[in-house]
A protein has these predicted regions:
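N-terminal active-site beta-alpha-beta segment that forms phosphate/nucleotide-binding
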Residues: 2-171
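Conserved phosphate- and dinucleotide-binding cores of soluble alpha/beta proteins
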Residues: 24, 30, 35, 45, ...
């Protein structure tokens, strides 16, 4: 089954079931608080007014550009990126992959997700949900053809909260991240909420790209249309750098310091 050709909506052709209310979350999930951000990495870290304004203006311009793509351009981008993702060695060797559901003109990952479901029985796919306890953080839940979905406060579909479906972020081998803008240095401009930066702050503190538990930190892969590239992004102290960026025309990989 093919995904919706438009990248600007949340409609999909998957067999997931939509629901209108959220399942009651039991104590184990509510108690799972993510690692706290150190003061030097706090989202409240000071940045100049000029940088804040520049990021806001750039975000507005790039969001308008990607929403302006035609349905055919969105479909072509989704197919090409799905093909490119399947060639990434570290993704092919992974067992748990996290992604996202399309919103606001983002690249649609449905082609890739369905290919994982159909051909890779040893791989688990996960989606982010707004954390029910820690404001501004994400929680990851497993996602299958039969997952029930509900729209969050941003009108984005996400799996219904359930303890048994929680996937700890440190168990994710790869996280495919939406973005608003990027540059060739691996910097990412998001929607401005800071959800990914807070949730993934531990990847910046992990020595030798490893988390404190000794397991490898997840590979962070930005997914974007080519028109979302800029010469140089204004970088904030809390921004989490990417390991790779995949667009319809190329794949960029980076070495973190």
């Amino acid at each position: 089954m093919s995904p919706s050709s438009s990248g600007s909506g949340t409609s999909r052709s998957l067999t997931s079931n939509k629901v209108n209310s959220t399942e009651t979350v039991s104590a184990p999930v509510l108690a799972m608080k993510p690692t706290q951000i150190a003061p030097s990495q706090s989202i409240q870290t000071s940045v100049s007014i000029e940088d804040i304004q520049a990021r806001a203006q750039l975000r507005k311009k790039l969001r308008e550009a990607r929403r302006g793509l035609t349905n055919q351009q969105h479909t072509d981008a989704a197919k090409r990126i799905a093909s490119r993702l399947r060639t990434l060695p570290f993704l092919d060797n992974s067992t748990t992959i996290a992604g996202y559901l399309v919103n606001d003109g983002e690249v649609n990952l449905t082609y890739f997700i369905e290919s994982i479901w159909q051909s890779s029985h040893d791989k688990k796919f996960a989606l982010p949900v707004l954390h029910p306890v820690c404001k501004g953080h994400l929680l990851f839940l497993s996602y299958t053809q039969h997952s029930q979905l509900v729209k969050n406060k941003y009108n984005i579909e996400e799996p219904v909260l359930s303890c048994k479906n929680v996937v700890p972020v440190r168990q994710c081998d790869v996280i495919l991240m939406p973005l608003v803008g990027f540059d060739v240095n691996g910097n990412r401009l998001g929607m401005g909420g800071g959800y990914y930066d807070r949730t993934l702050s531990f990847t910046q503190r992990a020595p030798d790209s490893h988390s404190f538990s000794g397991s490898k930190a997840p590979k962070l892969v930005g997914i974007a249309h080519d028109i979302q590239e800029v010469d140089a992004l204004p970088v904030a102290p809390w921004d989490v750098p990417l390991d790779a960026i995949v667009t319809p025309s190329r794949t960029l990989q980076f070495t973190k310091p």
